[in-house]
Amino acid sequence: MNDLKILNIKVNGINIFEDKLNVNFYCKDKVVDDNSVKNVYGTIYTNNIISIVGLNAVGKTTLLKIINLILQIIVNGRGINDVFNDISLLPEKFDYEVVFFFDDKFYKVHSYVQKYYEKSELKIEFIEEFIHSTNKSSISSKAKLNEFIETQLNGDNAEITRSKLPNISKLILKREDSIIGIITKDNTSFCRNMLDSVNLNYLYIKNNSPREILNLFDDNIEYLRKNSDDIADLSLKFKNSDEVYENKPLLFWNNILSSGTIKGNSMAFSCIPILKTGGYLIVDEIENHLNKQLIRVFIDIFCDNEINKNGATLIFTSHYPELLDFLDRADNIFVLTRNEGNKTNTKLLSDLIERNDIKKSDVILSNALKGTAPSYESIQSFKKFIANEVLYGKHGF
């Protein structure tokens, strides 16, 4: 299997973040066992779980969308305009750097991107790109990898430069396509995202849903079958009823089945091909519709190296720090906070805490890191406003 492993992503120029975004996929801390990690080469491992936590409106979903954008380009080989419909989130110009391992080599790509108009439609294009590679034998330690990540890549040390491609290649290459496809065209892994399921949680199944999947989320379902290519042409039977539901509109299925069953079914079907190929599954607000213990099942699957043999990665955001207690490591948890200038800081939990014997959820919920929980003052001010409005109704609610 020729699967690509992302090691580091840097993005420069995203306005809501204070500094250049730096997202590590590799394990910065010592690896003592191989659960929840995948060996890439030498002492370099990648995390099978990456979590993003923080208060409401701090930038978790924005960060997840940016990660998805990069993975869709690098891993899936898609054009930038095919995968990013929130162009308003992006500045007029920005650049990103990605370090990854593929085909027994370490690669670094640095891409410069800008907005442009085509027939009054706002789009994005690549204006310059550089690619450099090195044999795996030259990077067998985290120190060497970090040196490779931090090395400035430009036209002087690049092996491939977009603007210097042969004219025939420039004619074939679309403005929205990265030159990285030259390298990664044989990659067997892929990225799938569930970003839209936060607000649009609709039932969609390709084949009959196995009872083993359905009964984890609703043990009263006897079967759920797909009868044709029509997404709403299903048959459903519950164990406690003789009635069989068939030939119903799509909205009916979303009403008769619980939101948790629908999301759980979707996540399960998304997980399987990702686990097979060592790819990436991106889930926003993973706790939506699902019991905490059900989320743990998915986390455990990605952490179990007997199931996740190819080092697939689950990347998720959450408002619930309690989920972090299911994770063995802290170098895979990104904590987002706002500074006094209302810019978002992104830091690894492992860089913020010194002790490993404290529950991760306690650290976040106690606001010990400042900015990970509502302040005492804001809570008291809110309560006082509500109390005054209930008693005196000054604002006419």
Spans of features found by a protein language model:
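Phosphate-coordinating catalytic segments in nucleotide- and nucleic-acid-processing enzymes
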Residues: 1-24, 73-272, 276, 366-371, ...
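Switch/communication elements of ASCE P-loop NTPase nucleotide-binding domains
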Residues: 1-72, 244-374
